[in-house]
Regions:
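C-terminal catalytic subdomain
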Residues: 213-258
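Acidic, glycine-rich active-site loops and adjacent beta-strand->loop/helix elements
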Residues: 5, 9, 21-23, 202, ...
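Active-site-adjacent bridging/hinge elements
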Residues: 72-76, 193-202, 240-244
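Active-site cavity-forming subdomains of large catalytic enzyme subunits
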Residues: 1-125
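Accessory "access/gating" subregions that flank catalytic or transport cores
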Residues: 108-231
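A short glycine/serine-rich beta->alpha loop
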Residues: 14-23, 64, 204-213, 252-258
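Short acidic-hydrophobic sequence patches enriched in Asp/Glu that either
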Residues: 99, 130, 134, 258
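Short clusters of hydrophobic/aromatic residues that line enzyme substrate/ligand-binding pockets
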Residues: 44, 196, 252
């Protein structure tokens, strides 16, 4: 069974899995399509086309899997579809956070913002991990900026909240991301079989280890945090298009926005 997963990956054969299944626990109804592909049934994505699993396997010299004891149980009883999607989400949000920091710094330079809120000692005083990390990255990105110059133009003492606390909002996203990564790592590295077979005890136990509430709460929290980040970026963009606020041409366009 493990070799079938390996062979499909190495030969570029991807089982087609429904996005949604029946209402119930785990991904039982959807990821059974992986098992069906392994035995030569159902369709797969292969070299940019949708073909039958049997056709793709024949072209790659692979033989359909002959399922043994517990193989079907192993394929079906997991949350691999949801967990795999969450893993992709984690990767994309990590990249988004890094990009968000850099865009925020560009906004801050365009604003001629007050850099005091990003001071290391100020953020250590609060103690929020994501906030501290984001502030540190922003300070690094702004190294050499005119914002640190003694000859910089006059600036406001307190900037609008989405500027003054923009990196803190990104930090909140990072805190939510840490939560998701913690529970995702636990779930993808532990079994969710029901019943579970414990070889050391030579026994079988009924359980509910397929329950994903901890991970689901984290993903929902991350979605809320991303909504806050999106709102903050939108408000900063609106501000940057206001000449009475930036003292720059309207919409940052030449000839006063015409």
């Amino acid at each position: 069974l493990a070799n079938s997963y390996r062979d499909f990956l190495n030969h570029g054969i991807t089982p087609r899995i429904p996005r949604r299944g029946a209402v119930g626990e785990a991904d039982i109804t959807t990821i059974t399509h992986i098992g069906l592909a392994f035995i030569g049934e159902e369709d797969v994505n292969y070299k940019g086309k949708v073909v039958s699993a049997k056709e793709a396997m024949d072209k790659e010299g692979l033989k359909p899997l002959h399922l043994q004891l517990k193989d079907t149980h192993t394929i079906m009883l997991s949350n691999s579809q949801g967990e795999g999607t969450a893993a992709i989400l984690v990767h994309e949000v990590e990249n988004l956070v890094k990009m968000s920091d850099r865009i925020f710094c560009l906004d801050y330079e365009g604003l001629n913002g007050n850099i005091e809120p990003m001071r290391e000692d100020v953020n250590e005083l609060r103690g929020l991990p994501g906030q501290i990390r984001c502030a540190a990255r922003c300070r690094k990105d702004l190294e050499g900026s005119y914002l640190y110059s003694d000859n910089r133009p006059e600036h406001a003492l307190q900037d609008p909240l989405t500027f003054r606390g923009g990196f803190i909002i990104t930090g909140a996203v990072e805190d939510a991301l840490d939560y998701v990564k913690k529970f995702l790592s636990i779930q993808i590295n532990s079994p969710s079989d029901n019943p579970c077979i414990m070889l050391d005890k030579k026994d079988v136990f009924v359980n509910s280890n397929f329950e994903t509430t901890s991970l689901v709460i984290g993903v929902e929290m991350l979605a809320i945090a991303l909504a806050h980040l999106s709102r903050a970026v939108n408000y900063r963009l609106i501000r940057m298009c206001m000449p009475e606020f930036t003292h720059l041409p309207r919409f940052l366009a030449p000839r006063n926005g015409s």
